[in-house]
């Protein structure tokens, strides 16, 4: 394990890609706060060896609740020091075409994917600006670029995350805070594999230049690199981890 790099926060960290990101950041030397709204999934975090070693901290939290975010991130800083890295991975979507998208679903998807990212980033960035260092990685999707079909709200939210990330990089750079975006393609999460047939998965493979579907570890290793000292001169960038589904 690398030298202690301080505290990292990963939203949506109890499952899928988020869980893989937590593993990579722990291996890199971070103590990681695992933020998730799913209490059942979060409870499994407390069963892990890293929890027993004091390297992961489960935090049940809705990222759309600013008051709760300010309270919990403040408590984490008081107990473990200011946040050194934030990964905004939490997200959700609902099945619908553009013509069928309801206002209710639009608002819910935008709230989690875009507003929640904004709230978490702003609260964490205030700590980072004070200490004049930090890194934020926001997770986007190839859906923002029209690569695959899906709800209009999800595509709009992820496009918003990318624009927000660029603005953050410009405004936070003078304070020593780096901001980058990882654009995720089709990834073999447990959620995806449980819902798609072999035929559907094969169709998804055919949309990549590599002829393969990504693994959560592919995303996690990229995020860990961007959070590392090796990436100290990288900010304001969008990194596509999609097998070539989308190329910047």
PLM-predicted stretches and their roles:
Residues 97-98, 105-110, 192, 200-204:
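Substrate-binding pocket helix/loop in short-chain dehydrogenase/reductase
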Residues 181, 203-234, 241-243:
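C-terminal helical subdomain
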Residues 126, 170-174, 232:
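Alpha-helical segment proximal to the catalytic Tyr-Lys
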Residues 121, 157-160, 165:
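Active-site helix of classical SDR
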Residues 99, 146-152, 174-175, 211, ...:
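Active-site loop immediately N-terminal to the catalytic Tyr-X3-Lys motif
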Residues 2, 145-146, 224, 235-248:
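Short C-terminal tail/terminal secondary-structure segment
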Residues 141:
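Residue(s) in the substrate-gating loop at a strand-loop-helix junction
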């Amino acid at each position: 394990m690398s030298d202690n790099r301080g505290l990292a926060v990963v939203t949506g960290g109890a499952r899928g890609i988020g869980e893989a990101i937590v593993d990579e950041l722990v291996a890199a030397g971070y103590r990681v706060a695992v933020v998730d709204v799913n209490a059942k999934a979060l409870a499994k975090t407390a069963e892990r060896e890293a929890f027993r070693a004091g390297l992961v901290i489960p935090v049940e939290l809705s990222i759309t609740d600013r008051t709760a975010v300010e309270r919990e991130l403040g408590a984490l800083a008081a107990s473990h020091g200011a946040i050194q890295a934030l990964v905004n991975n939490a997200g959700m979507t609902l099945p619908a075409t553009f013509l069928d998208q309801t206002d209710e679903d639009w608002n819910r998807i935008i709230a989690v994917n875009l507003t929640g990212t904004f709230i978490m980033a702003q609260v964490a960035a205030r700590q980072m600006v004070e200490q004049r260092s930090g890194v934020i990685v926001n997770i986007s999707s190839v859906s923002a670029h029209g690569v695959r079909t899906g709800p209009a709200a999800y595509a709009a939210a992820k496009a918003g995350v990318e624009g927000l990330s660029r603005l953050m990089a410009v405004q936070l750079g003078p304070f020593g805070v780096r901001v980058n975006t990882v654009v995720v393609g089709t990834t073999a999460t447990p959620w995806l594999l449980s819902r798609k047939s072999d035929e559907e998965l094969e169709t998804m493979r055919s949309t990549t230049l590599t002829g393969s579907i990504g693994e959560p570890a592919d995303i996690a290793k990229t995020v860990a690199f961007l959070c590392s000292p090796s990436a100290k001169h990288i900010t304001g960038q969008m990194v596509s981890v999609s097998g070539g589904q989308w190329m910047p």
